[in-house]
Amino acid sequence: PSDMVDLIKSIKSASALTDHTVQIVTDGPNPILLNQLTQIFVMSEDWAKANGCEVSYNWDAGETSYCASNANGTGPFKITFREQDVRTVFEKNNDWWGDDSTFNVDTIELLPIANDATRVAALLSGEIDYTNVVPVQDIERIKSSAGHGVKMTPQNRTIFFGMDQGSAELNSSNIKGKNPFADKRVRLAMYHALDMEAIKDKVMRGQSVPAGIITAPGVNGHTAARDERLPYDPELSKKLLAEAGYPDGFEVTLDCPNDRYINDEAICVAAIGMFAKIGVDVTLDAKTKSQHFSEVKEGDANGMTSDMYMLGWGVPTFDSHYVYSYLFDSAGSWNKVNFSNARVDELVAAMGVETDQDKRNAMIAEAWDITQDDVTYLPLHHQVVNQASKSNVDVPIRMNNEPLFRFANVN
């Protein structure tokens, strides 16, 4: 199924009542329908049918369709040229229905530059005007460059590790016949082994916010109290491992992307060193994001699933139900830790239909109580968004790191 299915599965039908009124019928109450609809974009029915775009395709398997590479819409810019992974050109749409007084840009050229050093050099040399992918190690250099500036804001994305707690045995471990991660004491030991302040200072150059919960500030259900990390305490970790029956630790492989999150592989390397201090021998398997996510979600070519992995999660609906439906529900499409709790499943279903906000918030709080106590995931940090540009270029920074060029101005 499409990755969008969880956002629209409550919708039974949609019809146009007038030129400017759409009626949506759901299969029951949906308290976050409006939040979900912010992620759904309207396509022309005639265009979609004419180009065979009615059936979803499997992006993870490399499938594509006409509508994945051809524009259809009524936005402020038109695509006039596209060479995938090389160059895309947008021109102002003079027939746009919206207010064009918010921007003065006529042409945008998108140039994907994968290499960090090359991208920064292109900015400082004047080859490009703006980038929303800024290496943390280059922030001060860009700031000190005449004619350039850097903007920062907390991002709606939390980075964490997942541990398979549901399988009878880990694929990569030297422990056979049982699963160390099935024991909460082991998961807790892994948590206490992580010094996120050290990772913030040494790996992230201060550009991260250590997290105690796997959802970002601003999301319904997040609280400052829940975001307080448990203390870094490797001695307690060793004690917990011994109590769980692993005084000498164990071996496991950590799957990590090397081109998706800010300093993702470096974070994994640092964490592996910390796990080693408590006797857990972790082997790094770092790979490109396309391969990483495919193998975490579907298994590798041999059908082997990941024992431990890095994942980042943003919440476009700004509501915890989005987190729970994907990551904690027993049937969640990204619940690759194989967590299953009947009460949490009940709460996920209930918070999806409860319209009394106080009752719903209580359900969300109970779900977080259960899963934080379970140590289902190891929260690492909330990312920080950095964007850099020439001083005369103003692109408002957004916490989802998706720039809206209809608010961009060049002075």
Name each model-derived stretch:
Residues F77, H192, V209-E243, R260-E265:
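Structural transition elements
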Residues K184-L188, H192, K200, I278-K297, ...:
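Extracytoplasmic/peripheral linker and loop segments enriched in polar/acidic and small residues
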